Amino acid sequence: MVTVVDRVTDRRLRHPEKAHRPDTSVQKKPDWIRVKAPTSQVYKETHGIVRAHKLVTVCEEAGCPNIGECWSQRHASFMILGEICTRACAFCNVATGIPFAVDENEPERVADAVARMELKHVVITSVDRDDLADGGAEHFAKVIYAIRRKAPKTTIEVLTPDFRHKDGALEIVVAAKPDVFNHNLETVPSKYLKVRPGARYFHSIRLLQRVKELDPTIFTKSGIMVGLGEERNEILQLMDDLRSADVDFMTIGQYLQPTRKHHPVIRFVPPEEFESFAKIGKVKGFLHMASNPLTRSSHHAGDDFAILQKARDEKFALQR
């Protein structure tokens, strides 16, 4: 388990808003959560490319359990707009506080790394930047355009913040035409006040719906964590809400507590329940469902994109 103190310097707290909270209990992880430590040469090469281009990855910042597997396959999810978030969600390990100025050279560095790694599919995400007039939307667009120039065969997936109170921001990102637009709901609405207090559930639903209205050709995607105390019927209702917004793809994974200052794991959901959600999601009309304890938004994103394309082609063929 990581510490609440920033890895870069002992003088800056990673989560200052959580520093004085009492420690919460930490449950022992069940066997189905175990992952192997990263040791491969390709993992080291991926790490070297990320460092050489002075880039930030959500794989590291969020403490993703799949980093060893993904980096060993040259898969990486780049986090733009800095590494300090303006919000303080109870589940997230990304550092919080006052961000630095936007790095205008970042789009070219990201594109260079994508080209060098010869990525077939790349995921671009960011911290929340409530301090920026457009929430960072223009920067997202610049990154997309830079990748299109330097790695034209690479498909692009964006995982965006909610752009709350940022009129016109969503339109800027959609106009840049990512192949997949992902925005995570994270949890059921009854848990928002404690888990995701800076966001609004139905604003996020509307954001996803608006993407389809602006450009129906873009795949839409959203994900949640389970194990935060939600009820099964709440998850099923959330699925219906996403389908009402015409969302194509849903991910469901187990919440893992980053530190003792974060929201505790209320329950480790067994694999068979994840399998059940996957089956129900397909019945409800999602083109694809990724649902297992170690599922994360960017995990197997390239493979999932291929599945989405095939599923949509088959759907259109049946409608002819």
From Swiss-Prot:
Compositionally skewed regions (Basic and acidic residues) per UniProt: 19-28
Requisite cofactors: [4Fe-4S] cluster
A single cellular component GO annotation: cytoplasm
Location relative to the cell: Cytoplasm
Record: residues binding [4Fe-4S] cluster 1: 59, 64, 70, 298
Location of region: Disordered: 1-28
Entry note: cofactor: Binds 2 [4Fe-4S] clusters per subunit. One cluster is coordinated with 3 cysteines and an exchangeable S-adenosyl-L-methionine.
Gene3D superfamilies tied to this protein: Aldolase class I (3.20.20.70)
Domain Radical SAM core: 71-287
Keywords attached to this entry: 4Fe-4S, Cytoplasm, Iron, Iron-sulfur, Metal-binding, S-adenosyl-L-methionine, Transferase
GO molecular function, one term: metal ion binding
Pathway(s) this gene product operates in, as recorded in its UniProt entry: Protein modification; protein lipoylation via endogenous pathway; protein N(6)-(lipoyl)lysine from octanoyl-[acyl-carrier-protein]: step 2/2
Catalytic activity field: [[Fe-S] cluster scaffold protein carrying a second [4Fe-4S](2+) cluster] + N(6)-octanoyl-L-lysyl-[protein] + 2 oxidized [2Fe-2S]-[ferredoxin] + 2 S-adenosyl-L-methionine + 4 H(+) = [[Fe-S] cluster scaffold protein] + N(6)-[(R)-dihydrolipoyl]-L-lysyl-[protein] + 4 Fe(3+) + 2 hydrogen sulfide + 2 5'-deoxyadenosine + 2 L-methionine + 2 reduced [2Fe-2S]-[ferredoxin]
Enzyme Commission number: 2.8.1.8
Database matches in HAMAP family: Lipoyl_synth
Homology family: Belongs to the radical SAM superfamily. Lipoyl synthase family.
Protein name: Lipoyl synthase
Source lineage: Bacteria, Pseudomonadati, Pseudomonadota, Alphaproteobacteria, Hyphomicrobiales
